[in-house]
A protein has these predicted regions:
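Beta-propeller and closely related beta-pinwheel folds
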Residues: 38-60, 90, 98-100
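N-terminal cationic and glycine-rich segments that engage phosphates or anionic surfaces
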Residues: 13-15, 43, 84, 91-93
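Repeat-based blade/solenoid architectures
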Residues: 5, 53, 91-93, 100-104, ...
């Protein structure tokens, strides 16, 4: 099981809002946010996980979203949030996506976060595809192809719902970070591989991607309230890259730490939606 930390001190626990969770094995869960109003300092059970599963994403929702799950093998499913019934904190959830052998979910996005999906592969290629190209399906399906995986592209490592005025940061396993404008990328169809976004040295891959606000603070980091200097950005990228390397060998994070990070991301996403 995982534990939730009290990271919603700056927001009210509003009736009708939920925490929507996704795991790498395609399990999704929706719990009323009010269930987390009294989180103990030692944490609070948030979801029950199978031994070989882990939580990858948490979003704050209003029960009116379309949910997008994307896998490392380039599959995507879109379904209504209302297809998932609300459950208590300690429940395991339900099947959101039926995965093929070896595949796993690498990201979850909500319709309100953007009008296109920016998908990036481990070898530095990426593309934007309008969310209108993804038809709504029933929860639990296999989804549709959203990226053409080849030896040149490698597997998918990140997905973000974006608008044309957004920027993204790409972070490599060597701690290199670049910033790209979504407007500089071409809109492409679902079954394509995209274009090169970053030049990588041999044995270097993209570790993660992050969406950037106009004030240049990462929306994925709820504690970042001031602009980062170039030196601080490089240091942050190096830390993220080192963490990515460790995670590829073994799961070094505790459940408490992982849940805290994911809930912080959910808070940041919720704050952004309210600002808009």
């Amino acid at each position: 099981s995982s534990a939730a930390s009290d990271v919603y001190k700056r927001q009210e626990y509003t009736e009708g809002h939920f925490l929507f969770m996704a795991t790498k094995k395609g399990i999704v869960k929706k719990t009323p946010i009010t269930d987390y109003a009294n989180v103990r300092k030692t944490g609070l059970a948030a979801i029950s996980l199978r031994e070989d599963d882990e939580l990858i994403e948490v979003k704050k929702t209003d029960n009116n979203q379309d949910v997008f799950l994307v896998t490392k093998y380039g599959q995507c499913i879109r379904f209504k949030e209302t297809d998932v019934r609300k459950t208590g904190r300690t429940s395991m959830g339900v099947i959101g996506m039926n995965l093929t052998d070896g595949d796993e979910v690498i990201g979850m996005q909500m319709q309100s976060q953007g009008d296109a999906l920016m998908i990036v592969s481990e070898k530095g290629l990426g593309k934007c595809t309008l969310i209108s190209e993804f038809t709504t399906q029933n929860r639990g399906g296999k989804g549709v192809k959203c990226y053409k995986i080849t030896e040149k592209t490698g597997n998918i490592v990140g997905v973000k719902a974006v608008n044309q005025d957004n920027e993204l940061m790409l972070i490599t396993t060597e701690g290199i970070i670049i910033r790209i404008k979504v407007s500089d990328t071409t809109l492409l169809g679902r079954i394509t591989s995209g274009v090169k976004l970053i030049n990588l040295d041999e044995n270097v891959t993209v570790a993660s991607i992050a969406k950037v606000r106009e004030d240049k603070s990462l929306i994925d980091n709820a504690d970042t309230s001031e602009l980062l200097s170039e030196e601080e950005e490089k240091e942050s990228a190096a830390i993220a890259a080192e963490n990515a390397k460790k995670a590829s060998v073994e799961n070094t994070e505790t459940d408490d730490e992982l849940m805290k990070e994911l809930l912080e991301r959910a808070e940041a996403d919720g704050s952004e939606d309210e600002e808009e």
